[in-house]
């Protein structure tokens, strides 16, 4: 016997205060869009179905649909067109009743685009600190990842500060820097001591105050095939 699912979905996932803690959109590629969720959040109804539908804004009749059981924790919709805008909707049904609707608008990437550069967001920068933020995805797979941010003074490479944080924290900040000074800032991702990704920016701290980062020059490298799918450019759930 299933419980009464006519109430809002929060009743079926009492361990979580918000749907934002359960579902996360995967970054669009040139031909796919995906959604992940905590697969243990639906006890007793793991075999019920979640539907993911993508409607291109330029061709509303050319709809793509994919299905997955709630217990699987993931659904991916393939066969999309590159460089196209889609309205994507996820619906979950239990015993014929719709208990969840999530929607978002995505633009697929053009062919050949390197999406790994969209994971991390530099800033804000103050007169004494540099921060880098990153988007969350697949908590069950990324809990062991460590992100390290290093700031090296460009004029004196021997002067360096570094801070680390677990991936789930979403940001790391290096403090104690000199004001109005150019630093070589490097963000690195590690798992079990092995480096999987690094990206470098030349960033000048402010004379005073704080603002979003101004990148002076850019360089970076990454191993996209070993980043465990950490390619989320946004986690946005619009509940209807």
UniProtKB/Swiss-Prot annotation:
Keyword Repeat: yes
InterPro entries tied to this protein: FN3_dom, FN3_sf
Domain Fibronectin type-III: 1-109, 110-210
Annotated coiled-coil segments of the chain: none
Keywords from the UniProt entry: Repeat
Superkingdom of source: Eukaryota
UniProt name for this protein: 45 kDa antigen
Organism: Taenia ovis (Sheep tapeworm)
């Amino acid at each position: 016997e299933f419980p009464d699912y006519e109430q809002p979905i929060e009743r079926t996932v009492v361990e979580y205060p918000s749907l934002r803690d359960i579902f996360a959109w995967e970054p669009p590629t040139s031909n796919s869009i995906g959604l992940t969720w905590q697969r243990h959040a639906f006890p007793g109804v793991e075999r019920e179905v979640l539907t993911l539908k993508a409607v291109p804004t330029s061709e509303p009749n050319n709809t793509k649909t994919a299905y997955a059981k709630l217990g699987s924790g993931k659904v991916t919709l393939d066969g999309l067109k590159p460089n196209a805008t889609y309205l994507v909707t996820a619906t979950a049904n239990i015993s014929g009743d719709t208990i969840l609707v999530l929607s978002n608008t995505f633009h697929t990437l053009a062919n050949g685009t390197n999406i790994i550069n969209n994971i991390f967001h530099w800033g804000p920068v103050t007169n004494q600190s540099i921060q880098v933020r990153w988007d969350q995805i697949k908590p069950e797979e990324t809990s062991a990842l460590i992100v390290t941010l290093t700031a090296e003074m460009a004029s004196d490479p021997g002067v360096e500060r570094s801070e680390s944080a677990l991936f789930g924290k979403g940001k790391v900040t290096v403090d104690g820097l000199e004001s109005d000074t150019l630093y070589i800032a490097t963000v690195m991702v590690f798992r079990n001591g092995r480096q999987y990704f690094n990206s470098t920016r030349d960033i000048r701290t402010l004379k005073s105050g704080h603002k979003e980062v101004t990148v002076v020059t850019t360089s970076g490298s990454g191993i996209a095939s070993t980043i465990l799918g950490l390619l989320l450019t946004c986690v946005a759930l619009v509940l209807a």
